[in-house]
Design a protein with these regions (language model features):
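Conserved micro-motifs of the catalytic ATP-binding
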Residues: 58-65, 101-104
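Acidic ATP/Mg2+-coordinating residue in the GHKL
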Residues: 145
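Short alpha-helical Gxxx[C/S/T] motif in the catalytic ATP-binding
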Residues: 175, 179
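Short alpha-helical segment of the dimerization/phosphotransfer core of two-component systems
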Residues: 39-44
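Detector for a conserved hydrophobic position within an alpha-helical segment of the HATPase_c
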Residues: 182-183
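Short conserved segment of the HATPase_c
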Residues: 150-162
Length: 195
């Protein structure tokens, strides 16, 4: 992934240069075509960036510490609430965290939390529920929504890299794959199901 992403950057830079030149054309048809090209070039650049980020995450290892889990989860819940409300979704947060000490990599957990919430916002009709639980066995994050659920195919492939749902082709299909990787790096797992 990283080598492929690196090899794509040079031709994309050349294309971007030509596109910028064409956008300054006096011909309106040429400018319109160049504007469309620019949008596709931007999407390819984001795709290349995602490939590079994915490579780094696949090699990452958790840097856990015994953080203040209770306050950490309050921060997670607050940011999830703001994001959901900003996107017009109702949210119910159930925080079952007690004063317990557990070793977590907070950046890994934050990214998993953010990816799951983002996914739920995309597919929920109107409501999302998040539950945070912690025990000596581990940290549990459950996200559910009132959307139509995963198709049979999506249940099997949702954690594969670059898999996207039918109506969301503008996304790269990396969110749940990243969640899976980070959970596994942390000694956990990602479970996806329809309720």
């Amino acid at each position: 992934n990283a080598a492929f992403a690196h090899d794509l950057r040079t031709p994309l830079t050349v294309l971007k240069g030509y596109d910028e030149m064409l956008q300054s054309s006096s011909d309106s048809i040429t400018r319109d075509i160049a504007e469309t090209m620019g949008k596709h070039i931007f999407r390819l650049e984001r795709y290349v960036d995602s490939m590079s980020q994915l490579h780094r995450l696949e090699d990452a290892r958790p840097q856990g510490d015994n953080s203040d889990i209770k306050n950490f989860v309050i921060t997670l819940a607050d940011s999830a609430t703001i994001f959901c409300e900003k996107n017009g979704k109702k949210i119910c947060v159930q925080n079952n965290i007690t004063d317990i000490s557990i070793c977590l990599d907070c950046s890994f957990v934050s990214q998993v939390n953010n990816n799951l919430i983002s996914n739920a916002v995309r597919y929920a009709k109107s409501a999302i529920k998040i539950t945070y639980t912690c025990s000596k066995e581990g940290f549990y994050l459950t996200v559910s929504d009132d959307g139509c659920g995963f198709s049979k195919e999506a249940l099997c492939k949702a954690t594969n890299p670059y898999f996207t749902g039918e109506n969301h082709r503008e996304h790269f299909g990396l969110g749940l794959y990243i969640c899976k990787i980070l959970c596994e790096h942390h000694g956990g797992y990602l479970k996806i199901e329809n309720c």
